[in-house]
């Protein structure tokens, strides 16, 4: 049962020591710690400490993992500003005719009509133009050449000039080769500006081991953007709206889910993005899971009724984030906070390169 605090953003806050923010992945992807949340009520922890590798012994042959196959693009571009000085663009999404929604820094120096320069080489620069401010996101609409209408067409520029857009809490000077470590093994469809981080734990060895044991893996696409990682600001969560993100749920994935449930298996989402894609597709089908392609802005918070997924593999998320709301919708806010307190006591590593939590079907409220 919900209480009044479930609808207040401040109720999803917790204190985290800086040393528990993971700056790099574990040596092997599957070596991360795994907190297994078992059955229990809101006032019961009932958990097991393990490793991600151990998930192969927890899942059953009829079970299904659903992963996000989005690929992180090198969407961070260093630019020169009109009037001198350096700036930065983070490409968010194409808007047609060579126009892109971007987050710009310093935004105050990117006004409508301003020119920007992207240096392709010492003697070759691409001239960009600021069209306008995007009022909903606070970003800027930037005009590139007309041929740059999609991530695929932008690929050569990004490979030449772009950088992997790491979260601000990761010190890129201290960490590993992010072009490899910040991609999942399923990353095939470019369009994300942040990794679906739960999928980072699935190594080639673990994937093969799971398949050998008869555990199936299906894929969805959700291009991770502002809707996933932008900090929430409004205290009243009844007014919460998320920026839309593009998803695709295919007929093949729906068949895999249907077969899993018919065989008595459980559907485990790998990451909160997989949850949002599947549940959004179900809602778009008006009570039936159907193929879906398009933008979604689904908010999942306590009180949400899950219709597709049975369990979740997920990382430990930032305080007061939409991801924390989703986890709380599965296991309850009070229990979530107690589990996070246990994770901190046991020196779990948090956020993108951090450790993982497995929410089992019997623990879902």
Curated annotation (Swiss-Prot):
Q: In which pathway does it act?
A: tRNA modification; tRNA-queuosine biosynthesis
- Which is a GO BP term held by this UniProt record? tRNA wobble guanine modification
- Enzyme Commission code: 2.4.99.17
Write down the Gene3D superfamilies for this protein, in alphabetical order. QueA-like
Name the chemical reaction catalysed here: 7-aminomethyl-7-carbaguanosine(34) in tRNA + S-adenosyl-L-methionine = epoxyqueuosine(34) in tRNA + adenine + L-methionine + 2 H(+)
Where found in the cell?
A: Cytoplasm
What are this entry's molecular-function GO terms? S-adenosylmethionine:tRNA ribosyltransferase-isomerase activity
Subunit text: Monomer.
Recorded family membership: Belongs to the QueA family.
Function field: Transfers and isomerizes the ribose moiety from AdoMet to the 7-aminomethyl group of 7-deazaguanine (preQ1-tRNA) to give epoxyqueuosine (oQ-tRNA).
Q: Quote the protein name from its UniProt record.
A: S-adenosylmethionine:tRNA ribosyltransferase-isomerase
**Record lineage:** Bacteria, Bacillati, Cyanobacteriota, Cyanophyceae, Synechococcales
């Amino acid at each position: 049962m919900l209480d009044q605090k479930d609808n207040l953003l401040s109720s999803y806050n917790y204190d985290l020591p800086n040393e528990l923010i993971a700056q790099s992945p574990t040596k092997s992807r599957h070596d991360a710690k795994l907190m297994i949340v078992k059955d229990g009520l809101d006032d019961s922890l009932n958990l097991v400490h393990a490793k991600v590798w151990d998930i192969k012994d927890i899942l059953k042959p009829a079970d299904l993992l659903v992963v996000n196959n989005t690929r992180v693009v090198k969407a961070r571009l260093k630019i020169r500003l009109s009037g001198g000085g350096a700036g930065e663009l983070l490409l968010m999404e194409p808007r047609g005719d060579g126009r892109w929604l971007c987050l710009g820094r310093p935004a105050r120096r990117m006004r409508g009509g301003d020119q920007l320069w992207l240096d392709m080489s010492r003697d070759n620069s691409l001239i960009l133009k600021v069209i306008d401010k995007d009022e909903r996101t606070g970003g800027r609409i930037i005009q590139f050449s007309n041929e740059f209408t999609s991530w695929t067409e932008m690929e050569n520029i990004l490979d030449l000039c772009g950088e992997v857009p790491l979260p601000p809490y990761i010190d890129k000077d201290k960490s590993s080769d992010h072009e490899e470590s910040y991609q999942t093994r399923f990353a095939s469809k470019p369009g994300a500006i942040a990794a679906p981080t739960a999928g980072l734990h699935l190594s080639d060895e673990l994937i093969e081991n799971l398949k050998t044991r008869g555990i199936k893996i299906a894929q969805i696409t959700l291009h991770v953007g502002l809707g996933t990682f932008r900090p929430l600001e409004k205290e009243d969560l009844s007014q919460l709206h998320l920026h839309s993100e593009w998803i695709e749920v295919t007929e093949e994935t729906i068949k895999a889910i249907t077969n899993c449930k018919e065989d008595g298996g459980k559907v485990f989402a790998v990451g909160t993005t997989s949850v949002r894609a599947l549940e959004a597709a179900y809602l778009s089908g008006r009570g039936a899971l159907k193929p879906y392609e398009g933008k979604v802005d689904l908010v999942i918070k306590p009180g949400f009724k899950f219709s597709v997924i049975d369990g979740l593999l997920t990382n430990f998320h930032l305080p007061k984030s939409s991801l924390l709301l989703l986890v709380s919708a599965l296991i309850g806010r009070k229990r979530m906070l107690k589990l996070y307190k246990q994770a901190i006591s046991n020196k779990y590593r948090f956020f993108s390169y951090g450790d993982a939590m497995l929410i089992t079907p019997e623990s879902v409220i």
